[in-house]
Amino acid sequence: MKEVVRTEILKLLEVGIIYPIADSRWVSHVHCVPEKGGITVVPNDKNELIPQRIVTGYRMVIDYRKLNKATRKDHYPLPFIDQMLEILSKHTHFFFLDGYSGFSQIPISQPDQEKTTFTCPFRTYAYRRMPFGLCNAPATFQRCMTAIFSDFCEKIVEVFMDDFSVYGTSFDDCLSNLDRVLQRCEETNLVLNWEKCHFMVNEGIVLGHKISERGIEVDRAKVDAIEKMPCPKDIKGIRSFLGHAGFIGGS
């Protein structure tokens, strides 16, 4: 786990997202948590099959609970998913854009940077840019993205956090809309992750749903995951199943 932390620290230092800090009234601790992929089933001590997420690696996280407890909560809302999907499903051509390292594109004011201080086996650091783990990070990011694209939303693009869905009723219409969105990204220094972008497609997965001119469908991968789940044997298993089934039911 120490190497996981070392690798992440060196990466963040290299790009200037964090910097060493000598002292702070706010110090949070680092942890490593498993990164999980798909779902498999494994036998328990009673030889019953139970669902289990596949661990694909580990990542560094910071426990900001102490800071979050003292933070005044920002209740800025996220967009209504069903309304977004309804708008998108009425179109035939799409560009799906992805923001690069989402939260880290938001700078933190100098006086507040020391509040993000964290300690690890090497030394103590603070963030210049917004890290994951802060209770107001999602609201702050959504507010920023909405402000950037406020005059485009519900017209040529739908914005959910760092997922930007550009749409149009024809090839030329969608291409023109993309040009306007990319110009806005350049004007505001918003960086995109081209490797995760999909250009000029007739359908795509948005927030776990497949959208196209045919309408809104559930992502088949979600259905397959439920079909592979064994019959729940206890309360934990029932909750897990209901969580997955509720997603389908809400669709």
Predicted ranges, named:
Residues 1-251:
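Retroelement reverse transcriptase polymerase core
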